[in-house]
């Protein structure tokens, strides 16, 4: 088979040709093909052959074999994976540690703990993550040591692992880690104290709601909801006005968890918007325009931005004209948002939108062009100028 050109791994897998795939894995010089054969054998359930690939000459194949064994959770792989912790390549050692965590056998804890002495921080981080998956409280002291002494990646993974283990005795070192110089560590520690649900974390988490890093602020907001203390209500309401929408969303979810009832004001509007309940927000009237504009311009969800645009069109407030026009004529804005902006401008019906809509008749997307034409027709009819849109687009 291999003498007559490049082997077709997909075809071999379709035929369930284990012999052919084994030949590719053992004899083909191309690492990419050996890796493909490895994955095919994994899908076919030939895990003994996958275990054998831990001895492949290429570190990439060995690491992929370790990952595959972890994902399949075959306990026969435990000893070979423990041996792979001594591999000369750190990618393989890291993959083996992750896989042992996925197997879930606490017997692997001792060899994993020994790897905290590994010279590579990625391996030590993988060990911490694996120990968190195993969830054995015996790992707590070594993890606390890594939290206090390791580099940033190891500190972060140690914090997350302590949260997964869930022993409240770890609360003090985790609280200290909330003040870590590194944002990733602060975020991981905030997630961990949320898992522990200890009221001691309330004040430090409230402080993190003003952290310069938005990921830290978002995680603090989420963890405050998990801890479940009413002292967090006021600060979480303030967090609804955060300039980053991921923070707003987490604050809204935590407020819902704490049973907060929104009022008919801008914070209430932001609450509904963050939970993607735009219809409820629109019912509030004029106070919703500013937060809707924020969603239109900043949200990371294209569908959410489009929904905000349509809601602004439904409200019909002229304050939305500038932001809607900016979205319509910006080719970097997703097509679905540009279409919704055109639709909203047509619904508002202000003559200041005529020129931007005519410009949109030249948009590279046909659906945007069609929506712009419909919006122009809508405005022109409203102004008593029927047919003007067609003429403007026929130049």
Which positions does each model-derived feature cover?
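N-terminal segments that cap or nucleate solenoid repeat domains
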Residues: 1-49, 53, 58-61, 68-69, ...
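Core register positions within helices of long alpha-helical scaffolds
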Residues: 11, 40-43, 68-71, 99-102, ...
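Amphipathic alpha-helical scaffolding segments comprising HEAT/armadillo-like alpha-solenoid repeats
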Residues: 14-26, 44-55, 74-86, 105-117, ...
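TPR/Sel1-like alpha-solenoid repeat signature
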Residues: 69, 84, 93, 100, ...
């Amino acid at each position: 088979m291999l003498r007559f050109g490049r082997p077709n791994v997909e075809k071999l897998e379709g035929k369930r040709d284990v012999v052919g795939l084994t030949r590719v894995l053992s004899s083909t010089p191309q690492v990419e093909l050996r890796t493909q054969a490895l994955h095919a054998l994994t899908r076919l359930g030939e895990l003994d052959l996958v275990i054998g690939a831990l001895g492949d000459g290429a570190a990439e194949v060995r690491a992929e074999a370790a990952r595959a064994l972890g994902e399949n959770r075959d306990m026969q792989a435990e000893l070979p994976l423990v041996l792979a912790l001594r591999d000369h390549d750190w990618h393989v050692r890291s993959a083996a540690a992750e896989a042992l965590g996925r197997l879930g056998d606490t017997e692997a804890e001792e060899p994993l703990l020994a790897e905290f002495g590994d010279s590579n921080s990625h391996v030590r981080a993988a060990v911490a993550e694996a120990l968190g998956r195993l969830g054995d409280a015996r790992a707590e002291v070594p993890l606390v040591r890594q939290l206090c002494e390791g580099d940033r990646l190891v500190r972060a993974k140690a914090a997350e692992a302590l949260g997964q283990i869930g022993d409240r005795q770890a609360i003090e070192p985790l609280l200290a880690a909330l003040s870590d110089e590194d944002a990733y560590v602060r975020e991981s520690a905030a997630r961990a104290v949320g898992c522990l649900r200890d009221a001691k974390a309330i004040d430090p988490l409230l402080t993190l709601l003003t952290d310069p890093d938005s990921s830290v602020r978002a995680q603090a907001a989420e963890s405050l909801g998990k801890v479940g203390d009413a002292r967090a209500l006021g600060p979480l309401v303030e967090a609804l006005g955060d300039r980053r929408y991921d923070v707003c969303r987490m604050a809204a979810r935590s407020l819902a968890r704490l049973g907060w009832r929104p009022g008919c004001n801008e914070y209430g509007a932001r609450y509904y918007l963050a939970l993607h309940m735009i219809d409820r927000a629109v019912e509030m009237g004029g106070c919703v325009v500013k937060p809707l504009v924020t969603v239109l311009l900043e949200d990371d969800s294209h569908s959410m931005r489009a929904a905000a645009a349509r809601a602004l069109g439904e409200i019909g407030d002229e304050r939305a004209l500038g932001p809607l026009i900016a979205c319509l004529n910006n080719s970097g804005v997703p097509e679905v948002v540009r279409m919704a902006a055109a639709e909203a401008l047509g619904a508002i019906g202000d003559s200041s939108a005529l020129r931007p809509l005519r410009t949109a008749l030249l948009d590279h997307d046909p659906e945007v062009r069609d929506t712009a034409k419909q919006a122009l027709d809508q405005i022109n009819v409203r102004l008593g100028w029927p047919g003007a849109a067609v003429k403007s687009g026929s130049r």
